[in-house]
Amino acid sequence: MLSEDLVKSGAIKFGDFILTSGKRSDYYVDIKEAATDPNLLSEIASEFSKMIHARKIAGMELGAVPLIVATSLNMGIPYVIVRKERSHGTLSLIVGRLNRGEEVDVIEDVVTTGNSVLKAINVLRENGVVVKDAYCVVDREEGGAKLLENNGIKLHPIVRISELKR
């Protein structure tokens, strides 16, 4: 089971951690580390492939990139990358092709507050695509699903942190 494999791999650690936000947490989730293991990455892509219905997927650099590439290969569908703000090159926030009106599902590694994934969704919507669903490996259950719901997005996690903390 993926949740057990994430814990065994060290992608989910229990202890005392200080998060980027400065908050303390009794667990830490590092899906970027998990995505460097080809077997675990394949397992994650397989789980996403069972859930996703759109014919194109997208994700925010950096954390979602290996996830969307692996899922794209698994499903045989194209993907786009949403970049963080740029001050050089083409300044484009999208890598890949989008068609106005097409439905795109968004993949994220970890959802906490939902702000990061919502930022990616808003960039996609500004480019004329329809986003109704977001998928994540782990939902930390700290308000992200509610924020997305308030913006017309349904969050589909593979694992909820409450399932791991039983």
Curated annotation (Swiss-Prot):
Keywords: Glycosyltransferase, Magnesium, Pyrimidine biosynthesis, Transferase. It comes from the Archaea. CDD domains: PRTases_typeI. GO terms for biological process: 'de novo' UMP biosynthetic process; pyrimidine nucleobase biosynthetic process. Orotate binds at T112, R140. 5-phospho-alpha-D-ribose 1-diphosphate binds at R83, K84, R86, H88, E108, D109, V110, V111, T112, T113, G114, N115, S116. One of its GO terms (molecular function) is orotate phosphoribosyltransferase activity. InterPro entries: OPRT (IPR023031), Or_phspho_trans_dom (IPR004467), PRibTrfase_dom (IPR000836), PRTase-like (IPR029057). It catalyses: orotidine 5'-phosphate + diphosphate = orotate + 5-phospho-alpha-D-ribose 1-diphosphate. Pathway: Pyrimidine metabolism; UMP biosynthesis via de novo pathway; UMP from orotate: step 1/2. Its EC number is 2.4.2.10. Its cofactor is Mg(2+). Coiled coil: none annotated. Belongs to the purine/pyrimidine phosphoribosyltransferase family. PyrE subfamily. Catalyzes the transfer of a ribosyl phosphate group from 5-phosphoribose 1-diphosphate to orotate, leading to the formation of orotidine monophosphate (OMP). Homodimer. This is Orotate phosphoribosyltransferase. It comes from Thermoplasma volcanium (strain ATCC 51530 / DSM 4299 / JCM 9571 / NBRC 15438 / GSS1).
